[in-house]
Structures are given as C-alpha cells and as structure tokens.
C-alpha cells in the first residue's frame, strides 16, 4: 500500500506539472499553436459606385414621371425627390432622362425636369425635349449635364412616333451625347434610327454616345427590332443585366458609342443599378421607377 500510495503521489504531481503547458501555452511562442476562431469580415459590395478620376459617367434613367414604382403610383414631391436622390448619389456627368412633363394640368403644371435637377443637387444644366402635347402641356425626354462641361452646341431633332419623340444632341469639347426615348412601335423605332444615322455626319469629329430608353433589344427578332439598323453604326457599352424591375431578364435602356470612334473610348465600369447606397443605407431602386438607372464610366483616349 505504501508503494502504491507513493506511486500515486508521483503520478499526481506529474499530471499537475503539465497543466501550465496545456492551459497557458507554456512559453511566448505557444500562441501560434492556438487556432483563432474569431470570424473574419467578408468582402461586400458597398453599392456606392465610386467613379475613378479622369473618367466620364454617362447614364440613362426613365423617371416613370416620378410617380414611383410602389403600390401608390402618384405624382408627389417625395417621389420626385427620391428619383433625384438616385441621380445625386450616382452623380453622372451627363444623363438622359425619359418620361418628363411640363405644364400639364393634372400634374400641378410642374416642370418636372427642373424639379429633378433641384433634387439632384442643382449643379446641372437641363435640356427638355418637348415632344408631344399632353393635358394642356408637353411631355418628352431630357438631358442633364454638369455645368462644368460647357457644351459647344445643343439642338433637337423630331422623331416619328405614335407619340411624338425627340433626339437631343449636345456637343461637348471632347465628345457628343444624344439622348432619346424611342417609340413603342417597331416601324417608328426603325425610322428613328435612320434619322439618327442621318445626323451623325453633322456632329463634330469626336465620340458619339447614344443613350436612352430605346423600347427595344438586340435579343428580339430582327423583324420587330431596330437594333439591326442601330448596330450598323453603334456598339453597346452599358451593362445588359435587366433594366426593368418587373421584367428581370429584359434590357431596353442603353448607352452606346459610334463605331467610328469606339477605339477612342475605354470602358472602366458599367452597371444596371439595382441597389444603391443613399442617405446612410443601401436601398432598392426598384421602388423609385419602373426602370433601373443604367450607367457607364468611360475614359477618352
């Protein structure tokens, strides 16, 4: 018994002597053997769409007359402000905007493009393409451009349509920009592209960017699309990941460049903006309009 008890004491002492090594690591280098189970942060999209220095941001965005794409589709200052805040967050250099009204009786005789300009930060000049009479006023498309750009020429060209349409052509020192909203009917869209082609030789020798809600897609059959004509002279620059919230696989909003100058243009990034960081949080843009904003950042060579 004495031998066994002595043996027991020795084993107990040996066991306790190992506890510092097992529990505390035993030396200063032991931490390398202890797994770090602290969760590591995962990379996430910030949805801020920062623009790189030296690039030009071109955008197209259908306003849906700023009545929102919610269950309550009404003309309110809040809905107009929401639309303008999307533009303010993305801060394009030039933007084509569709579905605008001016002096319409049932819409408080507002000048919608001006209200959007004010909501977007007011550092833009505006051009309204007054195209068709409506409710005592006019409807049409428009273009906003940063006041620092200083265009050399601005003009408008009438387009055919069941509802009259316009091309807004603006020449800047380094490039040309054409904004529009094409008709719903195929023959009118095709005729509009022919008119666009007719205007190209009249523009300064610089890249020509064509942007808007084209009510058309290169994915459609040739007989119901204007794209076979359009792609003779233009190349699509913008993302085509679905520009309609209610039709996820359909893209009808585009930014293109003329083929004669496409080698002078480098695309840095392009997005159909479905989520956007605004006013301290990420928000869904599908409730603002029935179209998503589409932009492309380019660098001119």
Language-model features and meaning:
Residues 65-68, 102-105, 136, 185-187, ...:
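Active-site environment of divalent metal-dependent phosphoester hydrolases
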Residues 55-70, 155, 169, 174-183:
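Active-site-proximal beta-strand elements of phosphoester/diester hydrolases
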Residues 33-50, 100-175, 269-273:
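Structured beta-strand-rich core segments of catalytic domains in phosphoester-bond hydrolases
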Residues 56-63, 83-109, 144, 177-180, ...:
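Active-site beta-strand/loop signature of hydrolases that rely on acidic residues for catalysis
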Residues 1-10:
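Bacterial N-terminal signal peptides that target proteins for export
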Residues 27-46, 155, 200-209, 216-301:
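Metal-dependent phosphoester-hydrolase catalytic domains
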Residues 22-118, 133-134, 290, 299-301:
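N-terminal, active-site-proximal structural segment of metallo-dependent hydrolase catalytic domains
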Residues 10-20:
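Bacterial N-terminal signal peptides
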């Amino acid at each position: 018994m004495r031998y066994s008890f002595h043996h027991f004491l020795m084993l107990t002492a040996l066991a306790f002597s190992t506890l510092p090594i097992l529990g505390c690591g035993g030396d200063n280098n032991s931490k390398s053997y202890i797994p770090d189970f602290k969760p590591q942060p995962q990379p996430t999209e910030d949805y801020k769409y920062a623009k790189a220095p030296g690039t030009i941001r071109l955008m197209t965005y259908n306003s849906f007359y700023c009545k929102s794409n919610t269950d309550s589709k009404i003309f309110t200052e809040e809905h107009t402000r929401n639309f303008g805040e999307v533009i303010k967050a993305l801060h394009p250099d030039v933007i084509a905007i569709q579905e605008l009204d001016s002096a319409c009786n049932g819409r408080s005789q507002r000048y919608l493009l001006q209200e959007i300009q004010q909501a977007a930060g007011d550092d833009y000049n505006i051009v309204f393409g007054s195209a068709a009479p409506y409710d005592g006023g006019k409807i049409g498309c428009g273009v906003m451009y940063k006041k620092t750009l200083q265009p050399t020429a601005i003009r408008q060209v009438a387009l055919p349509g069941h509802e009259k349409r316009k091309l807004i052509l603006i020449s800047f020192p380094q490039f040309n920009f054409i904004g529009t909203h094409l008709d719903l009917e195929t023959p009118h869209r095709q005729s509009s592209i022919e008119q666009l082609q007719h205007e190209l030789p009249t523009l300064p020798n610089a890249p020509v960017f064509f942007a808007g809600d084209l009510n058309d897609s290169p994915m459609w059959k040739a007989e119901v699309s204007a794209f076979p004509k359009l792609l003779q002279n233009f190349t699509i620059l913008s993302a085509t990941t679905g520009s309609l919230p209610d039709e996820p696989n359909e893209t009808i909003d585009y930014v293109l460049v003329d083929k004669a100058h496409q080698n002078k243009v480098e695309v840095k990034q392009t997005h159909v903006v479905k989520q956007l960081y605004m006013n301290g949080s990420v928000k869904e843009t599908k409730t603002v309009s029935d179209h998503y904003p589409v932009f492309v950042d380019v660098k001119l060579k």
